[in-house]
Amino acid sequence: MAPRVSVVLPVRDGGPWLAEAVDSILGQTLKDLELLVVDDHSRDGAVDALDRNDTRLTIVPSEGVGVSAAFNTGLARARGTFIARMDADDIALPLRLERQVGYLDAQPEVAICGACVELFAAEGVRSGNRRYQDWLNGCRDPAAIRRELFIESPIPNPTALFRAADLRRLGGYADPDWPEDYDLFLRADADGLSMGKPEGV
């Protein structure tokens, strides 16, 4: 039986952060998921070191080179109604997917759902990054996201949750000479797709 959500996590040399990112997905309150870790030709052994006891986790070798090719490899294997993006150096709070799926279930006119973020770094987060975080977290409803879309991408890429049919119709991630996530969100907007963020995540 197909899972509700397929989480695609492309990674190249995920280092010490990968296991924590994986654990944060497998520890979601929404349990009906699969996690596809797509290995983009890693050399650091982090993918090999993952605990594979959870049957929801699948390691997939990328069919190309680069993050877009790796994500699209996972997208081709994904079985879920929704496709979530995750990065190897991020942590998803436990309610992320439950709240996002609930939001899209309640808002059938919205095709892409993001979430708020809290930036963190070993050396601390600088004031400019704090302002960027505040701007990201202030763009919540579809009207605000569309209004701000041509300033910068209001959907943080590793928080994105897509309706699988819409994402496939858009062709997944392209490989432009600029950020692949921003390119995808601009293509989604041009296609008339709406984007939003739920409260509380």
Where are each of the predicted segments found?
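Conserved nucleotide-sugar donor-binding catalytic segment
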Residues: V7, A76, A115, N137-V201
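Cell-envelope/extracellular polymer assembly enzymes that use nucleotide-activated donors
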Residues: P3-S6, S24, E34, D183
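A conserved acidic beta->alpha catalytic loop
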Residues: S24, K31, D39-D48, D87
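Conserved donor NDP-sugar-binding/catalytic core segment of glycosyltransferases
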Residues: L95-N129
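Short aromatic/hydrophobic "clamp" motif used to bind/position activated sugar donors
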Residues: I83
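A conserved hydrophobic helix/loop-capping motif in glycosyltransferases and polysaccharide synthases
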Residues: R4-W17, A21, Q28-T29, V38
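Acidic helix N-cap motif at the loop->helix transition within catalytic regions
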Residues: P16-A19, D44-R52, I91, L95
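Glycine-rich, basic loop-to-helix element that forms the pyrophosphate-binding segment
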Residues: S62-A78, R99
